[in-house]
Amino acid sequence: MLLQIAEPGQSAVPHQHKLAVGIDLGTTNSLVASVRSGEAKTLPDMKGNVILPSVVQYQEDKICVGMNAYQSAAMDPQNTIISVKRLMGRSLKDIQARYPELPYQFSESENGLPVIQTAQGEVNPIQVSSEILKSLSRRAQDTLGGELEGVVITVPAYFDDAQRAGTKDAATLAGLNVLRLLNEPTAAAIAYGLDSGQEGVIAVYDLGGGTFDISILRLSKGVFEVLATGGDSALGGDDFDHVLAQWIKEQAGITSPLSSQEQRELLTLATQTKVALSDSDNVKISFKDWSGEISVELFNSLIQPLIKKTLMACRRALKDADITSEEVMEVVMVGGSTRTPFVRTSVGDYFGQTPLTSIDPDQVVAIGAAIQADILVGNKPDSEMLLLDVIPLSLGIETMGGLVEKIIPRNTTIPVAKAQEFTTFKDGQTGMMVHVVQGEREMVEDGRSLARFSLKGIPPMAAGAAHIRVTYQVDADGLLSVTAMEKSTGVQSHIQVKPSYGLSDNEVANMLKDSMTYAKEDMKARALAEQQVEADRVIEGLVVALNNDGDALLSKEEQAEILQAIEALITLRQGTDAQAIEDGIKKADEASQEFAARRMDASIRAALAGQSIDEV
């Protein structure tokens, strides 16, 4: 008889290779990769294609995903969903404002999320994304010959909580076990870092079909640290197609609106022309009754404003990282749109070096995700690689006066947990509203509200006596949990922040820009609000003290002097001069100094009443 012997807690077959994959869930195309025989490779379909167009067509009796769906887009635009990643985590109003030309019939669900009317009924962006993930999962399981233990799915670094949560929901709907969501530029760094063993600062320029990300990373002794991120969640190669399509419309003299089918045909023509211009100086094109020619120089001039926007984001990211372009050792190009020669030369000129393109820019993200999945599933327990992502915008809490107290600053590495203690403002206060905000500005009204929740059951105490510990925790996927706990009783309240929809495009960049533009004004506004809050505290404290002990401890003249100081402070409090309010607070403190001393003496006498010196 043969017995299988294993260490306690270990598998009886500890060297069995667990099946895990990395998925690049892209706006235009998606890929799946896995580590096989020690090497990460993308997995092809039965026809040998590694790229799966991120297109889903809903027919009455079936759902098509990929190339078949893509080829049907022009004939059946309303039932063929392309670039669904652009819709993830957005409100219907935001989608209609940003993409008015989309051929879909939208409506709004009961919870305010957008749904698309198709031949199979209503579908939402999460369901559409899940169909793409199902297709990639089937491909992986057929190729690898078994059930998947887990997946790592990549997302743009600029995806907010709602967009990340939507991606995880899509994976769950597809029956996948998500090991981790991974920022796309970070996945590329893993692929290049492990392949070439570089150490130092690198810039990852990721221009896909629908998103742009720039990440400044430091690679050192196996540690991938993201120093800063930037980008635009709605800028990519699709926009190249749109500006070229608009040019063709103008050249053809088309002024009346196009049908859905004609619009799709025009965009398909624009895409084909863009690709052809990567290898040719001139391309002949025709649309409807018009024929013409476009040169690569003209095409470059059309897309130059879009490329300039990406380079401005690069400049901001370098500034955030406190790095100069000269300190960047390598520039990694990621995303199919970086195949455009003018993109490569523009980025090369900006950074003063030839960008790295040795790994297929379409496949590099999936390859990096596969390497990470292989580690997380336990196939490389001895791996020393450490991965540190960052949050793109500061997370804070509203305090008295509409001020923002930042708990976790932007560009903090995640996962992270930070706590801060707060107290009550009024005597006998038994509840507290916790307002979670996002952004770089000093005042709540200038930031983005994420969530509100209440902490109830605080024991009645004097103002400032209660201790409420508020903990912000961001997990590896960038999702935020907030807990508030009153320390003496242990009573607590908790919320996981999952906004109903995400930031509109350019909003993150604008929030960062505004924080610099209005820095001086914000600090003045904060200083004023802080003095107003302090004035309120002093006024309320003195009024309560006078009501309780004024007659017993003060003469009428002394009471009148303090009341005069209070009234003067109330008047100053209503103004906008922070220094004047601060001076008024000092005068009120000086006027009440003797009163405070007498109250302290009276309290001590009351506490010691009836006790002997020995007992004291």
Swiss-Prot record:
What CDD domains does the record point to? ASKHA_NBD_HSP70_HscA
Q: Which organism's genome codes for this protein? A: Aliivibrio fischeri (strain ATCC 700601 / ES114) (Vibrio fischeri)
Summarize the protein's role.
Answer: Chaperone involved in the maturation of iron-sulfur cluster-containing proteins. Has a low intrinsic ATPase activity which is markedly stimulated by HscB.
PROSITE patterns, sorted: HSP70_1, HSP70_2
Keywords for this protein: ATP-binding, Chaperone, Nucleotide-binding
Instruction: Write the protein's name.
Output: Chaperone protein HscA homolog
- Record's keyword annotation contains Nucleotide-binding: yes
Tagged with keyword Cell membrane: no
PANTHER family per record: HEAT SHOCK PROTEIN 70KDA
A GO molecular-function annotation: ATP-dependent protein folding chaperone
What family does this chain come from, according to its entry? Belongs to the heat shock protein 70 family.
For this protein, the record's InterPro entries field holds: ATPase_NBD (IPR043129), Heat_shock_70_CS (IPR018181), HscA_NBD (IPR042039), HSP70_C_sf (IPR029048), HSP70_peptide-bd_sf (IPR029047), Hsp_70_fam (IPR013126), ISC_FeS_clus_asmbl_HscA (IPR010236)
Q: Which domain of life is it from?
A: Bacteria
Q: Which GO terms describe its biological process?
A: iron-sulfur cluster assembly
